[in-house]
Protein backbone atom coordinates (compact mmCIF):
# COMPACT_ATOMS: atom_id res chain seq x y z
CA UNK A 1 0.00 0.00 0.00
CA UNK A 2 3.00 2.30 0.00
CA UNK A 3 3.46 2.39 -3.76
CA UNK A 4 3.20 5.75 -5.54
CA UNK A 5 0.72 4.28 -8.03
CA UNK A 6 -1.83 3.71 -5.26
CA UNK A 7 -1.64 7.31 -4.07
CA UNK A 8 -1.73 8.65 -7.62
CA UNK A 9 -4.82 6.61 -8.48
CA UNK A 10 -6.46 7.71 -5.24
CA UNK A 11 -5.71 11.34 -6.10
CA UNK A 12 -7.15 10.95 -9.62
CA UNK A 13 -10.25 9.23 -8.24
CA UNK A 14 -10.83 12.03 -5.71
CA UNK A 15 -10.27 14.65 -8.40
CA UNK A 16 -12.84 13.07 -10.72
CA UNK A 17 -15.31 12.69 -7.87
CA UNK A 18 -14.97 16.33 -6.88
CA UNK A 19 -15.38 17.53 -10.49
CA UNK A 20 -18.51 15.40 -10.83
CA UNK A 21 -19.94 16.71 -7.55
CA UNK A 22 -19.23 20.32 -8.54
CA UNK A 23 -20.86 19.79 -11.96
CA UNK A 24 -23.98 18.38 -10.32
CA UNK A 25 -24.05 21.30 -7.88
CA UNK A 26 -23.79 23.87 -10.67
CA UNK A 27 -26.28 22.04 -12.88
CA UNK A 28 -28.99 21.33 -10.33
CA UNK A 29 -28.18 23.40 -7.24
CA UNK A 30 -28.80 27.08 -6.47
CA UNK A 31 -26.36 28.37 -9.16
CA UNK A 32 -28.53 26.72 -11.85
CA UNK A 33 -30.92 29.70 -11.65
CA UNK A 34 -28.23 31.84 -13.31
CA UNK A 35 -27.75 29.50 -16.27
CA UNK A 36 -29.38 30.54 -19.52
CA UNK A 37 -31.52 28.24 -21.65
CA UNK A 38 -30.73 28.71 -25.36
CA UNK A 39 -33.84 26.78 -26.41
CA UNK A 40 -36.07 29.10 -24.42
CA UNK A 41 -34.36 32.20 -25.85
CA UNK A 42 -34.89 31.06 -29.44
CA UNK A 43 -38.66 31.11 -29.96
CA UNK A 44 -39.91 30.37 -33.47
From Swiss-Prot:
Family membership: Belongs to the PsbN family.
Cited function: May play a role in photosystem I and II biogenesis.
Transmembrane segments: 6-26
Membrane topology term: Single-pass membrane protein
InterPro entries: PSII_PsbN
Entry's Gene Ontology BP terms: photosynthesis
Pfam families, alphabetized: PsbN (PF02468)
Tree of life domain: Eukaryota
GO cellular component entries: chloroplast thylakoid membrane
Protein name: Protein PsbN
Originating gene: psbN
Main location: plastid
Alphabetic keyword roster: Chloroplast, Membrane, Plastid, Thylakoid, Transmembrane, Transmembrane helix
S-S bonds: none
Compartment(s): Plastid, Chloroplast thylakoid membrane
Amino acid sequence: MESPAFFFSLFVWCLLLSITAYSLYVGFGPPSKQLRDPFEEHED
